[in-house]
């Protein structure tokens, strides 16, 4: 299929149908040549990143919106506008390929309209670009409800957060310590002419100067290295697992944190629990590539009686289901799929899982509560509420008035993440 047509289909699936980009994009990639996968990804990610600006420009250039069965052609116009405004593709190629996309989408009669809209944008680009950022939705390209949360929670930092969310994310690696230490792998990258730098805190993290195909990484197929953001790798630092312990990774998919534990310690057993059977397949695949073994269980963390084997855990990593507002730069569709009311519902779910997991922790054991969110309701407020109702919970490494550590997007080039460490008093 024409790449621009495929991109329009992805935008339609995400924006109009509410499907996630992580589902829609791989499906679309199956319809195009492998060499075009990166181009399709760049167009889809970029168009979703700057969606309100593109929508406002399209609205100015069209007499009436395309509706119903023609909605996919509306998204094709957005694809064309993104290429012209944000990519280095020659204008004639961007316009020509986008117009041809209408043919691939079985709308040849709309080719003239699409061509006219894109040509008019070229003629009036400066004025239209200025108009597209003249309102908050276009200036910050975040939904108003999320912008308000960020402004209230981070009055001095919200603009930095927004900027980080709108930037492309770097590619972080986690070196498998069972094969190489980080300095050794850094040298392997250097030998392969791959520029990279170390992280100051995450002991196995390396940041690439530019993203690359994983198969070009030394020893990827042999399990020497994995792709994982440095903020997620810090889960190991906070959990501090020891040899011989019984450890639970709750809400474990896709398995990066489970693997990190196994790469670093000889636990008696690591249990990887998740309620999504399809996502658990990723856990199994990742462990297989890394030649690691864990007990993988499909079950609801709120109902341990369905899967628990009767022995409490020494350590529990609770990477709770969350709004994922800390990883928007990696998943720009979150801005348009998430709703304000989702935060309240997720906080309730987190609370239920928190209580259920605490009962599975040994006296003297450690539970690390983690999210990839930056909303206080899911993080600081969640932990405060848990401490208030759980006398045996002792907070470690932070103050009760401001529990845990909130990593903001872009901090040391990391994703947004939250960690709180709790010990169960005997």
Curated annotation (Swiss-Prot):
Keywords, in A-Z order: Cytoplasm, Methyltransferase, Ribosome biogenesis, RNA-binding, rRNA processing, S-adenosyl-L-methionine, Transferase
MF annotations from Gene Ontology: RNA binding; rRNA (cytosine-C5-)-methyltransferase activity
Residues binding S-adenosyl-L-methionine: 251-257, 274, 300, 319
InterPro entries, per the entry: MeTrfase_RsmB-F_NOP2_cat, MeTrfase_RsmB-F_NOP2_dom, NusB-like_sf, NusB_RsmB_TIM44, RCMT, rRNA_ssu_MeTfrase_B, RsmB-like_ferredoxin, RsmB-like_N
Enzyme class: transferase
Compartments where found: Cytoplasm
Catalytic residue positions: 372 (nucleophile)
EC number, UniProt record: 2.1.1.176
Stored Pfam families: Methyltr_RsmB-F, NusB, RsmF-B_ferredox
Primary location: cytoplasm
Reaction it catalyzes: cytidine(967) in 16S rRNA + S-adenosyl-L-methionine = 5-methylcytidine(967) in 16S rRNA + S-adenosyl-L-homocysteine + H(+)
Domain of life: Bacteria
GO CC annotations on file: cytosol
Any one GO BP annotation for this protein: rRNA base methylation
Recorded family membership: Belongs to the class I-like SAM-binding methyltransferase superfamily. RsmB/NOP family.
Role according to the record: Specifically methylates the cytosine at position 967 (m5C967) of 16S rRNA.
Protein name, UniProt field: Ribosomal RNA small subunit methyltransferase B
Lineage of producing organism: Bacteria, Pseudomonadati, Pseudomonadota, Gammaproteobacteria, Vibrionales
């Amino acid at each position: 299929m024409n790449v621009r047509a495929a991109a329009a289909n992805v935008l339609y699936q995400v924006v109009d149908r509410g499907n996630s980009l992580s589902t829609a994009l791989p499906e679309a990639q199956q319809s195009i040549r492998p060499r075009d996968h990166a181009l399709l990804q760049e167009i889809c990610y970029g168009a979703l990143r700057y969606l309100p600006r593109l929508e406002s420009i399209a609205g100015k250039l069209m007499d009436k919106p395309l509706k119903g069965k023609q909605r996919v052609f509306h998204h094709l116009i957005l694809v064309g506008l993104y290429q012209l405004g944000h990519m280095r593709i020659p204008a004639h190629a961007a316009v020509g390929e986008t117009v041809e996309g209408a043919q691939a989408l079985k709308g040849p009669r709309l080719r003239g309209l699409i061509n006219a809209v894109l040509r008019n944008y070229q003629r009036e680009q400066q004025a239209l670009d200025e108009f597209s950022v003249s309102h908050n939705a276009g200036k910050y390209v975040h939904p108003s409800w999320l912008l308000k949360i960020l402004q209230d929670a981070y009055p001095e930092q919200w603009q930095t957060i927004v900027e980080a969310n709108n930037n492309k994310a770097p590619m972080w690696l986690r070196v498998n310590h069972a094969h190489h230490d980080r300095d050794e792998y850094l040298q392997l990258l250097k030998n392969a002419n791959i520029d990279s730098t170390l992280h100051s805190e995450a002991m196995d993290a390396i940041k690439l100067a530019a993203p690359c195909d994983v198969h070009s990484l030394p020893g990827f197929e042999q399990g020497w290295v994995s792709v994982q953001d440095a903020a997620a790798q810090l889960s190991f630092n906070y959990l501090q697992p020891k040899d011989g312990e019984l450890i639970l990774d709750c809400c474990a998919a896709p398995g990066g944190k489970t693997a990190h534990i196994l790469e670093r310690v000889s636990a008696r057993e690591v249990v990887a629990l998740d309620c999504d059977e399809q996502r658990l397949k990723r856990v199994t695949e990742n462990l297989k590539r890394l030649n690691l073994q864990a007990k993988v269980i499909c079950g609801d963390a709120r109902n341990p009686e369905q899967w628990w084997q009767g022995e409490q855990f020494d350590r529990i990593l609770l990477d709770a289901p969350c709004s994922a507002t800390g990883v928007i730069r990696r998943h720009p569709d979150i801005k348009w799929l998430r709703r304000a009311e989702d935060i309240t519902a997720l906080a309730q779910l987190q609370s239920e899982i928190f209580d259920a997991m605490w009962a599975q922790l040994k006296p003297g054991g450690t539970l690390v509560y983690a999210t990839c969110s930056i909303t206080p309701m899911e993080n600081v407020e969640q932990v405060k509420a848990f401490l208030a109702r759980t006398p045996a919970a002792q907070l470690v490494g932070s103050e009760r008035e401001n529990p845990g550590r909130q990593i903001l997007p872009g901090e040391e080039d990391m994703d947004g993440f939250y960690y709180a460490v709790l010990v169960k008093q005997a």
